[in-house]
Amino acid sequence: MIRLKAPTPERPLLLIDAGNTRIKWAWTAADVAPPAVAPGGTPWQHAGARPHDQLAELVEDWRDCHAGAGMAPPDVWISVVAGPALRDALCARIARVFDGARLRIVASEAAAAGLRNGYRDPAQLGTDRWVGAVGARHAWPDTALLLVTAGTATTLDIVAPDGRFAGGLILPGLTLMMRALSRNTAQLPEIDIGYLAARDDAQAPADVPSWADNTQDAIALGCVTAQAGAIAQTWQALQAQYPGPYRCVLSGGARAALAPHLRMPFQMHDNLVLLGLQVLAHTGHEGRPGAATQA
C-alpha cells in the first residue's frame, strides 16, 4: 500500500488532462486525499472540460475557482498528449493568471506510486495511459484491471494484480472509425456518436439487434460492435492470464455510447487521468517542472 501525504496544504491542486480533443480538469484542496471511487465518478470540488480552441474560457474557469478559494496559487499537475504547442500554451496562460503557481508536467516512467511500467521502453507509453493506470491502481489495488478509455482513440490497458502495467491495445475511437468509412468511400454517409446515442436511447439494451437493415445503422452498429468485441476478447484474456478479482473500468468522452454494447460487468469513471494526477501529487512525485516554474 502506498502511503499518501498532502502536498503543500495552503495551495490547492489544479489537475489537467490535455487530451487529443478536449482539456479536462479538476480543482481540489491539497489536503483532500484521492477518494475511494464510487460508481458515477469522482467528487472533485470543481471540474470541467473544454475543446482546445477555448483556452481563454478555460483560464476563466480556473480563475473563478481560485477566487472562490481565496488561497495561494495552485500546484498544477498536467498530463499532455496533444503535443508541445498546447503544453506550452497551457503553461504560459497559467503563469500569467496565477503568479507563483508551481507546474509539474508528468511523463511516463519506469515506476511511480506503486505501479511498475511493463512497456519495453517506458517512455514510449502515452502519458494519459500511464497516469490513468496509476489512478486505477490506487482505486482498485490487488485487482486485475482492464481499463477502457473511449476517446479520440480507444485504448484497452491491462494492470496486473501485482501492480504492473502489462500493456494494452490502441484502436481508432468510435468517431474516428465512423468518419474513416465516409471519408474513404464514395457512398457511405458520415455519422457521429450523437446518432449512435439516439439510436441506443430508443431501445432497451436487450433489444439491440446484432445486425442492421439500413446503412446508417449498419455503420453505427458495425463500429461499436468492433470496439465491444475487442473489449470482450481482452476481458477473456485477462481472466485467463491472472487470478481475480477482476474489474473493467470504462472512461473517456465516448464511454456512454459504448456502454450499452458491453456484455461484461464494468464500472464507469469520469476521468482516471485526473485521479492519477492527484495520486502522484499526494505521493511526493516530483514530475518535470513546467515553464512557469523554470522561469
UniProtKB/Swiss-Prot annotation:
<keyword id="KW-0963">Cytoplasm</keyword>
<feature type="binding site">
    <location>
        <position position="215"/>
    </location>
    <ligand>
        <name>substrate</name>
    </ligand>
</feature>
<keyword id="KW-0067">ATP-binding</keyword>
<protein>
    <recommendedName>
        <fullName>Type III pantothenate kinase</fullName>
        <ecNumber>2.7.1.33</ecNumber>
    </recommendedName>
</protein>
<comment type="subunit">
    <text>Homodimer.</text>
</comment>
<keyword id="KW-0547">Nucleotide-binding</keyword>
<dbReference type="GO" id="GO:0015937">
    <property type="term" value="P:coenzyme A biosynthetic process"/>
</dbReference>
<feature type="binding site">
    <location>
        <begin position="126"/>
        <end position="129"/>
    </location>
    <ligand>
        <name>substrate</name>
    </ligand>
</feature>
<dbReference type="InterPro" id="IPR004619">
    <property type="entry name" value="Type_III_PanK"/>
</dbReference>
<keyword id="KW-0808">Transferase</keyword>
<keyword id="KW-0630">Potassium</keyword>
<dbReference type="GO" id="GO:0005524">
    <property type="term" value="F:ATP binding"/>
</dbReference>
<feature type="binding site">
    <location>
        <begin position="17"/>
        <end position="24"/>
    </location>
    <ligand>
        <name>ATP</name>
    </ligand>
</feature>
<dbReference type="InterPro" id="IPR043129">
    <property type="entry name" value="ATPase_NBD"/>
</dbReference>
<dbReference type="GO" id="GO:0004594">
    <property type="term" value="F:pantothenate kinase activity"/>
</dbReference>
<comment type="function">
    <text>Catalyzes the phosphorylation of pantothenate (Pan), the first step in CoA biosynthesis.</text>
</comment>
<feature type="binding site">
    <location>
        <position position="152"/>
    </location>
    <ligand>
        <name>ATP</name>
    </ligand>
</feature>
<feature type="binding site">
    <location>
        <position position="119"/>
    </location>
    <ligand>
        <name>substrate</name>
    </ligand>
</feature>
<comment type="similarity">
    <text>Belongs to the type III pantothenate kinase family.</text>
</comment>
<dbReference type="Pfam" id="PF03309">
    <property type="entry name" value="Pan_kinase"/>
</dbReference>
<comment type="pathway">
    <text>Cofactor biosynthesis; coenzyme A biosynthesis; CoA from (R)-pantothenate: step 1/5.</text>
</comment>
<feature type="active site" description="Proton acceptor">
    <location>
        <position position="128"/>
    </location>
</feature>
<keyword id="KW-0173">Coenzyme A biosynthesis</keyword>
<keyword id="KW-0418">Kinase</keyword>
<dbReference type="GO" id="GO:0005737">
    <property type="term" value="C:cytoplasm"/>
</dbReference>
